[in-house]
């Protein structure tokens, strides 16, 4: 190889491309420097700590990826391989070299006695741990991956909570009042009995708001409740109906704003200048952190539990619950080095997420989709494999809603990631099929969007112009340009040219966009009923982002009550056992609204910790 320092770019997580500098001698890799400033914070931190050193020490590219950060790990290896090729070396030979030797040690045993043990260090687990520490409890956290965060790190960021005093500062958008009118006109007999009184109260709120002529953004806990309930009310393939348990939905919407305030008190900074709406949220009530994505929550909570004395054991997989006389009294786990860990605790929290990264398990339980492909992509962390659900079953926990799987309609068609391309608020979505035609109300629920996309063959495109581009989440112009250069995002000066690049008929795409623009002007979409379109698509350059549904959220899980107790098959509390977040079921029922997951994990994680502290001293 020709000695020198080579500058390359490697694919990171999401839309980022990581600049790298690789210094080579004529026969060795001497140094690897990665500029990860554009990488998704919290997902691949351990990659940049471990992998370059492992490659340099072992003088091989045959290295294992870092658990939970496969894409970034492959990106680092690929970047070094590119540098070797540029230097005239044989990258394939480096990839075929022996793996670095792993030091072995005799099996160890660790034992802990504590007040609280938390299994899974995503948002729900860290919320439970933080709140337990606020109650002066001793806390042990078990996380099977090298770093904290779980799926929460990958979340888009907006957290649903009705906050009418704040929302009054924002103007109502064209069509939002029509959405409220349609909701209020829902026949009462279509509302399940336990929700009817609240629905009638909501009707009166909407009637009063419309009659007042107010032009501000309306919201209330009741609107959030009824949208969550109706948004999750579904039938499976056999015609069995499911909807969210009233007490769980009520607890969520009545406590979500307190969760936002609690997080703010801990140090999470929210952008008060913008009320946002993730895809499939149905309403603008999202509290968006200033920092990008879910890392805004994870680093604050992670730092807080560390600073306040939690014992954090990463790369430690919980394998069994300890049971005594029908009560859960702790966990048995193993570290990746073989060390056996036994934690005895007064309170055990299962917060290990759902099973969206376990395709065979998804296929086993699915009763909602006609077919789940073996090679379907997922938006999930590889950690999300159903571990906490299996642990709960050991204690006799009831499962609920397991057949309902949410597909994220606007995922990367190759990786399943959320934030490649131009991912905007759904008010700015223009979804077109491979013929260049719109095919759905872009404001609809996620399962509706995913089903419509599947009916079109799966692959579709989000069309944007320069103004819509400015509303995209979690990206930069540098990243956009890099994706255009890589051929994963398409850009053109005219719609006709853009159509040619993605294989559409130019006249069809132009006609579609012209009609869409006219609907924005009119405030009414006669084709698909999209009620709130923010921007027209008319300012060059134009973009097409390829999208395809991927597994996103598993609504089912352990049955819980409103206090976070795990319930058995007779709906009795399992003493000492609590759950929250995607590990639990019963809240979202058949479909989860965008932005409700963050409200869920922080609300039920926090409240379950309050319950445990009160019950277990």
UniProtKB/Swiss-Prot annotation:
Alphabetically ordered keywords of this record: FAD, Flavoprotein, FMN, Oxidoreductase, Phosphoprotein
Active site (catalytic residues): 446
CC annotations in GO: membrane
Residues holding FAD: 124, 143, 151-152, 156-157, 387, 553, 582, 598
InterPro entries listed in its UniProt record: FAD-dep_OxRdtase_2_FAD-bd (IPR003953), FAD-oxidoreductase_2 (IPR050315), FAD/NAD-bd_sf (IPR036188), FMN-bd (IPR007329), Succ_DH/fumarate_Rdtase_cat_sf (IPR027477)
Enzyme class (EC, first level): oxidoreductase
Cofactor: how and how many bound: Binds 1 FAD per subunit.
Keyword NAD: no
FMN phosphoryl threonine carried by residues: 70
Further comment: L.fermentum strain NBRC 3956 is significantly more abundant in subjects with type 2 diabetes (T2D) compared with subjects with normal glucose tolerance (NGT).
Family, per entry: Belongs to the FAD-dependent oxidoreductase 2 family. FRD/SDH subfamily.
Identification of the protein by name: Urocanate reductase
Gene designation per UniProt: urdA
